[in-house]
C-alpha cells in the first residue's frame, strides 16, 4: 500500500534536483549545477582567431599551439604583454608565422594530400618553417618513414618542432569558456572594429536608398552634434569630489545617481536598497529614489587591478635581510594585509616555525606553533588566484592557509618552483635580492639546521622587523588627492574668469554719467512679468530644440494647395409668388 503523502505528479524539487535530465530541465543541467565545464562548452572553429573570435587572415601561433591573427594579437601584446587565452607572459618574438595552403574554393588544405582541414582534423605545424599539415601526413611520410624533412621546403626538423594546433581528442584546448580574456570580459577587437560593430547602418547599402540616404546622413550628423554638446556640457559640469586623508570606515554612505548629478568615484554598482525596504515595510523611513552605496577607500582600492604600482619591503631576520617586491595588481588584499600588519609591528620578534630544505620556509605566526595568527581584519580573507602569477621560481612569496579562503597572517617563501601549489596559495610577492633569486640570506635560511622531527629551525630564526619602503596604497591616495586638487584649482580659475567677465560686461552697461544702458537681455527681463510670458518661454524653448530637426534634408517636391471650388448659391428667400 502506498503512503498518503505520495504525489501523483513530479514535484518542483524533483525537477530542480541535481539528477534532473529531461526536456524541461535541459540536458546537462545537473552538470551545470555541479560546476562541470561540459554544460557550458563552446568550441572555437579551427579557422578562427582565439582573440578576436573572427576568421584569421594573417595566422600566427604560440609555442603551445594557440592560433591568433597577427593584426589582433600585436596590439594586445603591446598593451597587456600576456597570452589572452591562458594569461601567461607573451612577447611578439614568441609568435610563429603560419603558412596554410588553400584550394580553389578558399578552404584550408593539407599541402601534400590536399585534404581539407576541418574542425575534426588533427592539425600540426612545424616550428622552424611554419608550414601546416594534417597529422596523418606527418605520421605516415615523416615519422614512420624516418624522413625528418619538411615536405614543402625540404628543411630538416625534429620531433620537438611539431606543434599541435588542433587535436580532436583534446577539444578542451579550444573551449571558449576557458579563455582568460573572455572570463575577464576584455574585448580583443580594436576601437575601430568596435565602432563599426556598434554602427546600426553598417549592413545597409546607403546608395540604394535614394532620398532616404540624405535622412540617414543628416541623422548621423545630428547625433554627432548632440554627442559633442553632451561632452562639452559634462566637462563643464563635472566637479571634483572632496575626500579625506583617513580611510573611511566600513559604514556605508550613499549618493544619488539622478540625472545631472556627478557620480562619486567610489560609487558601488548596487544601491542601498532603502527604496525597496521602505516600500515593503512601514517601519522604514520612506525613500522615493534609488541611491548608490559608496565604497570605503579600502574597498575601493582592494579591487583587483585598481592599484597597479608595486610595493617594496624588507624582512630583517637574525640570519640576514630579504628584500621583497609585492604584486599589488594581482593580490591587493594579501598585499594590504601584509603591509598593515608590518606597519602595526605584528611581525616583530616572530619566529619561522617551519623550514624544509628544497621546499620552503614558513612564518608569520606570533604563537610560533603554525596554528595561530590573524589578518588585519581579524578574520580569514579570500584567496586571489586570478592573474598570471605561478609558483614557477625560487623566492616566491605566498600566503599560508588551512584550506580554501583561510588566509590570515602566515606566509612562506619557496626554495624552488612548486607548481603543485598553484591555485592553492595566493602569491603576493617575490624575493628581489641580488643576484635574484638566489639571495645569500635565502641560501643561509635553507641550510640552517632544523629539528628533523618538527622541521623547526634550531636555533630559532626570528624576524627582527619588517620595513615597508613603498606603500602602493598610500601612493595611490596621494596621486588621487593631487589630481583632485588640480581639478578643483582649475574649476576655481574658470569660475573666477567667468565672474570677472560678467563684472566687466556689467560695467560696460553704465555710462560715465551713471546712467545704465539697456542690455540685450533687458527687454526679455521686462516682459517676463507681462501677459503671455509662458507662451514666449515655450516658443523660445521650442526654437532652441529646432536645431536638431532633419526635415530640411528630405528631397521632395512641394505640392500646391488645390484651388477652392466656388460655391454657387441658390439665392435668397422667395416671396411665394410661384405658389398656386
From Swiss-Prot:
It catalyses: [protein]-peptidylproline (omega=180) = [protein]-peptidylproline (omega=0); S-ubiquitinyl-[E2 ubiquitin-conjugating enzyme]-L-cysteine + [acceptor protein]-L-lysine = [E2 ubiquitin-conjugating enzyme]-L-cysteine + N(6)-ubiquitinyl-[acceptor protein]-L-lysine. It is found in: Nucleus. Residues 309-468 form the PPIase cyclophilin-type domain. Disulfide bonds: none annotated. Keywords: Isomerase, Nucleus, Rotamase, Transferase, Ubl conjugation pathway. Residues 439-457 have a biased composition (Polar residues). Pathway: Protein modification; protein ubiquitination. Residues 42-115 form the U-box domain. Residues 182-201, 227-259, 439-459, 479-530, 553-580 are annotated as: Disordered. One of its GO terms (cellular component) is catalytic step 2 spliceosome. CDD domains: cyclophilin_RING (cd01923), RING-Ubox_PPIL2 (cd16663). One of its GO terms (molecular function) is ubiquitin protein ligase activity. Residues 490-507 have a biased composition (Basic and acidic residues). Its EC number is 2.3.2.27, 5.2.1.8. GO terms for biological process: protein folding; protein ubiquitination. May catalyze the cis-trans isomerization of proline imidic peptide bonds in oligopeptides thereby assisting the folding of proteins. May also function as a chaperone, playing a role in intracellular transport of proteins. May also have a protein ubiquitin ligase activity acting as an E3 ubiquitin protein ligase or as a ubiquitin-ubiquitin ligase promoting elongation of ubiquitin chains on proteins. Belongs to the cyclophilin-type PPIase family. PPIL2 subfamily. This is Peptidyl-prolyl cis-trans isomerase-like 2. The lineage of its organism: Eukaryota, Fungi, Dikarya, Ascomycota, Pezizomycotina. The gene is cyp8.
Amino acid at each position: 500500500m502506498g503512503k498518503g503523502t505520495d504525489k501523483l505528479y513530479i514535484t518542483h524539487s524533483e525537477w530542480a534536483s541535481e539528477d534532473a535530465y529531461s526536456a524541461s530541465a535541459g540536458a546537462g543541467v545537473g552538470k551545470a549545477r555541479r560546476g562541470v565545464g561540459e554544460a557550458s562548452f563552446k568550441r572555437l572553429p579551427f579557422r578562427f582567431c582565439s582573440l578576436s573570435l573572427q576568421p584569421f587572415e594573417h595566422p600566427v601561433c604560440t609555442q603551445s599551439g594557440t592560433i591568433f591573427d597577427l593584426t589582433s594579437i600585436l596590439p594586445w601584446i603591446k598593451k597587456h604583454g600576456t597570452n589572452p587565452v591562458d594569461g601567461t607572459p607573451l612577447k611578439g618574438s614568441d609568435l610563429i608565422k603560419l603558412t596554410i595552403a588553400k584550394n580553389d574554393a578558399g578552404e584550408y588544405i593539407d599541402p601534400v594530400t590536399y585534404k581539407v582541414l576541418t574542425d575534426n582534423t588533427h592539425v600540426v605545424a612545424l616550428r622552424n618553417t611554419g608550414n601546416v599539415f594534417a597529422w596523418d601526413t606527418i605520421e605516415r611520410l615523416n615519422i614512420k618513414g624516418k624522413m625528418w624533412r619538411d615536405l614543402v621546403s625540404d628543411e630538416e626538423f625534429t620531433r620537438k618542432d611539431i606543434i599541435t594546433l588542433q587535436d580532436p581528442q583534446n577539444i578542451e584546448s579550444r573551449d571558449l569558456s576557458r579563455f582568460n580574456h573572455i572570463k575577464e570580459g576584455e574585448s580583443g577587437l580594436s576601437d575601430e572594429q568596435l565602432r563599426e560593430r556598434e554602427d546600426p547602418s553598417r549592413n545597409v547599402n546607403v546608395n540604394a536608398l535614394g532620398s532616404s540616404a540624405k535622412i540617414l546622413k543628416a541623422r548621423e550628423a545630428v547625433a554627432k552634434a548632440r554627442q559633442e554638446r553632451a561632452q562639452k556640457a559634462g566637462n563643464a559640469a563635472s566637479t571634483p569630489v572632496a575626500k579625506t586623508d583617513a580611510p573611511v570606515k566600513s559604514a556605508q554612505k550613499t549618493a544619488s545617481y539622478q540625472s545631472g548629478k556627478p557620480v562619486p568615484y567610489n560609487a558601488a554598482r548596487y544601491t542601498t536598497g532603502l527604496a525597496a525596504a521602505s516600500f515593503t515595510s512601514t517601519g522604514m523611513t520612506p525613500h522615493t529614489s534609488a541611491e548608490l552605496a559608496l565604497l570605503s577607500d579600502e574597498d575601493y582600492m582592494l579591487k583587483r587591478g585598481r592599484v597597479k604600482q608595486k610595493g617594496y619591503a624588507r624582512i630583517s631576520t637574525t640570519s640576514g635581510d630579504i628584500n621583497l617586491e609585492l604584486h599589488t595588481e594581482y593580490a591587493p588584499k594579501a598585499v594590504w594585509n601584509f603591509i598593515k600588519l608590518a606597519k602595526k609591528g605584528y611581525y616583530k620578534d616572530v619566529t619561522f616555525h617551519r623550514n624544509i630544505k628544497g621546499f620552503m620556509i614558513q612564518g608569520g605566526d606570533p604563537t610560533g606553533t603554525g596554528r595561530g595568527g590573524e589578518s588585519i581584519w581579524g578574520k580569514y580573507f579570500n584567496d586571489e588566484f586570478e592573474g598570471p602569477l605561478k609558483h614557477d621560481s625560487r623566492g616566491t612569496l605566498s600566503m599560508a592557509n588551512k584550506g580554501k579562503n583561510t588566509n590570515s597572517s602566515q606566509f612562506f617563501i619557496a626554495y624552488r618552483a612548486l607548481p603543485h601549489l598553484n591555485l592553492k596559495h595566493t602569491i603576493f610577492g617575490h624575493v628581489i635580492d641580488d643576484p635574484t633569486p638566489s639571495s645569500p640570506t635565502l641560501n643561509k635560511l635553507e641550510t640552517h639546521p632544523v629539528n628533523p622531527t618538527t622541521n623547526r629551525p634550531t636555533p630559532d630564526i626570528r624576524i627582527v622587523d619588517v620595513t615597508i619602503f613603498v606603500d602602493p596604497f598610500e601612493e595611490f591616495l596621494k596621486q588621487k588627492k593631487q589630481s583632485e586638487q588640480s581639478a578643483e584649482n582649475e574649476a576655481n580659475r574658470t569660475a573666477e574668469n567667468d565672474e570677472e567677465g560678467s563684472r566687466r560686461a556689467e560695467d560696460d552697461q553704465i555710462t560715465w554719467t551713471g546712467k545704465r544702458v539697456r542690455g540685450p537681455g533687458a527687454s526679455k527681463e521686462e516682459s517676463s512679468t507681462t501677459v503671455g510670458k509662458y507662451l514666449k518661454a515655450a516658443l523660445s524653448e521650442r526654437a532652441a530644440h529646432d536645431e536638431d530637426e532633419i526635415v530640411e534634408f528630405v528631397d521632395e517636391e512641394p505640392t500646391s494647395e488645390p484651388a477652392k471650388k466656388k460655391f454657387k448659391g441658390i439665392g435668397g428667400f422667395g416671396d411665394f409668388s410661384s405658389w398656386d
